[in-house]
């Protein structure tokens, strides 16, 4: 996910800035309302990223509503089975094209490297380019399996 990089405050070879982050805490409840477990995730403050410096492209294709209606109409009229899926923590699976640096998570600063920052290799929640990185990763995977995106909707993949 990341590696520690030393930062010289006087001269920095990094073209991008160091993004700060914060912890987001949540508690999950059981159906009866009792506490199931606590959850925590590190979220970077992507709203501080600067276009052209910290990221380039952010566009990620999203399936068009008309495409969903058309596919469901075909499936119903031809009695095809319909399946769906969800990728847990999808945005964390995207590979980054740009160099992105963030501070070490509060409470998890490496005592041997306190002046280092994290060079991210994968996207994190909050990054401007996280949706695009995920889309590129899943599209490449589907292409490897033999699926192709259609001309009418880049988010509709068909198996040839």
Task: Explain the meaning of each model-derived region.
Residues 1-160:
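Long, low-complexity, charge-biased intrinsically disordered regions
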């Amino acid at each position: 996910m990341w590696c520690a990089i030393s930062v010289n405050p006087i001269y920095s070879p990094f073209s991008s800035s160091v993004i700060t982050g914060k912890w987001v805490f949540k508690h999950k409840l059981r159906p009866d309302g009792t506490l199931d477990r606590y959850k925590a995730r590190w979220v970077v403050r992507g709203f501080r990223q600067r276009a052209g410096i910290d990221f380039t492209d952010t566009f990620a294709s999203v399936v068009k509503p008309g495409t969903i209606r058309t596919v469901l109409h075909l499936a119903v009229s031809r009695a095809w089975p319909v399946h769906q899926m969800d990728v847990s923590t999808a945005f964390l699976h995207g590979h980054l094209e740009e160099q992105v640096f963030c501070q070490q998570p509060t409470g998890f600063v490496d005592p041997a490297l306190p002046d280092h920052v994290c060079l991210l290799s994968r996207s994190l929640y909050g990054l401007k380019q996280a949706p695009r990185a995920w889309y590129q990763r899943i599209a490449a995977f589907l292409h490897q399996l033999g699926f192709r995106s259609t001309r009418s909707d880049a988010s509709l993949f068909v198996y040839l």
